[in-house]
Swiss-Prot record:
PTM per Swiss-Prot/TrEMBL: Predicted to be exported by the Tat system. The position of the signal peptide cleavage has not been experimentally proven.
Record's keyword terms, sorted: Antibiotic resistance, Hydrolase, Signal
A GO term, aspect molecular function: beta-lactamase activity
Reaction catalysed by this enzyme: a beta-lactam + H2O = a substituted beta-amino acid
Secretion signal span: 1-34
Active site: S82
Protein name per the record: Beta-lactamase
Pfam families cross-referenced by the UniProt entry: Beta-lactamase2 (PF13354)
Additional facts recorded: The class A beta-lactamase family has a specific amino-acid numbering system, sometimes called Ambler or ABL numbering and often misspelt as Amber. A multiple sequence alignment was used to derive a consensus sequence and then the consensus was numbered taking into account insertions and deletions. This allows use of identical numbers, e.g. for active site residues, despite differences in protein length. UniProt always uses natural numbering of residues, hence there appear to be differences in numbering between this entry and some papers.
Enzyme class: hydrolase
The organism's place on the tree of life at top rank: Bacteria
KW Transcription regulation (keyword) present: no
Amino acid sequence: MGTTGARPSRRAVLTAAAGAAVAGIPLGGSTAFAAPRGNPDVLRQLRALEQEHSARLGVYARDTATGRTVLHRAEERFPMCSVFKTLAVAAVLRDLDRDGEFLATRLFYTEQEVKDSGFGPVTGLPENLAAGMTVERLCAAAICQSDNAAANLLLRELGGPEAVTRFCRSVGDRTTRLDRWEPELNSAEPGRLTDTTTPRAIGATYGELVLGDALAPRDRERLTGWLLANTTSTERFRKGLPADWTLGDKTGGGAYGTNNDAGVTWPPHRPPVVMVVLTTHDRPDAVADNPLVAKTAALLASALG
């Protein structure tokens, strides 16, 4: 899994993302699995991981340099959980902001709203409760710290969860749907259709947002910058990927041990890899399985790196 070369700088990654959009790198994934050279047993290893961890594992990974893909349960629905926050922020940037004016708008909220959201590490700080927060800071909190109250405030400005579904449809994603607010959207019952996506759908959408032209260049750079600054992936993608692969991602978790990570990673000196790992269980008492996500990321890096 070792990779030589210096880890790309944040500026280099943002520049490369802009270049990918201009170059029109194909992001939509092939329906066939192309076994990476030297590692024909990737699917077998993914099935073994699934059995080892008694989980349902969904995978979409696409090497934008070669078009090679790794797909496992890529068309099955999984609870989305906080992975949706990237979509909500992207919708705010595209549909509500004009030249940064809306991002500078200060929103006010109550302590009860933070408590009701279930998780507010940034919105719940006394100084933010007193003074409110700008939309720009709420976007950063929603992605970088996965702040639920920040996400709910953004959803409120958008007009509710269904606005995220409409946004997905507008960028070609006919699968991903958001129906509820935080924290109810994380209930993750097996078989539920609401608040779900598939590995292929969310992977293609993340790719369009970060590497495609779904957003204006300035908005794409902002969104990518927040994904690069994410703090919640330490035990998930970040632990499984080589240290010199730059990572911009968003995690998510909920009931039934649901544990997700989705984003884009930049190996040194080469185009990026879009990567999605979605996991869940059929037991309500199951706990989030970070090692499964990290091991899957390591396997994908080895296969496509």
